[in-house]
Amino acid sequence: MSEILSVKAREILDSRGNPTVEAEVILDSGYSGTAAVPSGASTGSREALELRDGDPARYLGKGVLQAVQNVNDEIAPKVIGMDGRDQVGLDSFLIELDGTENKGRLGANAILSVSMAAAKAAAAECELPLYRYLGGAMASLLPVPMMNVINGGAHADNNVDIQEFMIVPAGAPTFGEALRMGAETFHNLKKVLKSKGLNTAVGDEGGFAPNLSSNEEAMEVLMQAIEAAGYRPGEDIYIAIDAAASEFYKDGSYHMSAEQSPTKSAEEMIAFYEAWAGRYPLICIEDGMAEGDWGGWQALTRKLGYNVQLVGDDVFVTNTSIIAKGIADGVANSVLIKLNQIGTVTETLQAINMAFKAGYTVVISHRSGETEDTTIADLAVATNAGQIKTGSLSRSERIAKYNQLLRIEEELGASGCYAGMSAFRV
């Protein structure tokens, strides 16, 4: 048994300058692990609850001192002496200690910080990289990156409705080459935008955030950038979008300010996506329908699920009970995985396993409010997920994950493999 010797949490800042929770777990062997929790801007209504202080005089109400106190004063005394290598046992205890459906008493940010830090401490004690500790001997698949190079919606202060436009270098032979292809396309995209007199300031996730004449103009400039970088759209590099449709869904309709026909029914939204899939190498649509539009999701899946990856984020929130219902009802064909949506490492792994068993694909994801923590890079390899979303080719909190994947690829050597097009079952 490897006993937990101490647990300490602190308040740090994320990439948006908002407070978040960082925890450090030390084992009796002297090995330790430190983990920081991310935070989202567009969130599903059924996500595990992120505890904020609500004091307007401090960090505009976004402080996390209560969550930190919950770790230091309530969680720490009760987990000291527990087996640091028993991740399932620790996480089950934390869930029981909280006692709520959404981890709202202690805070999912408090619970997750301890869960992640304990996993890192145990990996260090075993003298294993985190991906090997969590995934075992079979962890060897480097994920295809979905690189968010144009930001809109809740991630940027512009007029673009679609939250993310991503380049997907699925045609690369290795992860390192995929990263290079993405970076070169990103730099060419900046040139394309500048040539059109468009703003090249970046949004929360490091992508450009220009005002555009329409949502489709974003697709057009992406195509130009891919070709300008010397790559073939639909062979070397594909396109993915995160509509985050819940953000513009109201009173049963979708309201898109950048469109000539701004109000759309579910059927019209599906036709909108179908038209794009016909004109562009659109390999993936995330949150194409609102989380509350279950019927719209089913219709979208019936219409496009055979040739486009349809990822559920807000609709599933990494929750196995909701994912199970989606699988049974024919909603989406892929699940986005975010650690802080559910709040423990164990529940995250359970969600991934459920998706894979149902024949769904899995995309490991960051949040718009990130830190230098690289856990999700290891998680992607540990689970052989095959796909990762961790932002653009700028901002160090995004690049940190890419650099960690480069290190993992180097460490795996000939035993590693880049997922490429095999990650997509469409």
Curated annotation (Swiss-Prot):
Give its E.C. classification number: 4.2.1.11
- Cofactor note as given: Binds a second Mg(2+) ion via substrate during catalysis.
Q: From the Swiss-Prot or TrEMBL record, what is one GO molecular function term?
A: magnesium ion binding
Which biological process terms from the Gene Ontology are attached to this UniProt entry?
A: glycolytic process
Q: Which CDD domains match?
A: enolase
Name the catalytic site residues.
Answer: E205, K338
One GO cellular component, as annotated: extracellular region
Classification via InterPro entries: Enolase, Enolase-like_C_sf, Enolase-like_N, Enolase_C, Enolase_CS, Enolase_N
Q: What is its main location?
A: cytoplasm
Residue positions binding Mg(2+): D242, E286, D313
Listed under catalytic activity are: (2R)-2-phosphoglycerate = phosphoenolpyruvate + H2O
Could you say which cofactors this protein requires? Mg(2+)
So where does (2R)-2-phosphoglycerate get bound?
Q163, K338, R367, S368, K389
Gene3D superfamilies according to UniProt: Enolase-like C-terminal domain, Enolase-like, N-terminal domain
HAMAP family the record matches = Enolase
PANTHER family registered for this protein in UniProt? ENOLASE
Name of the protein: Enolase
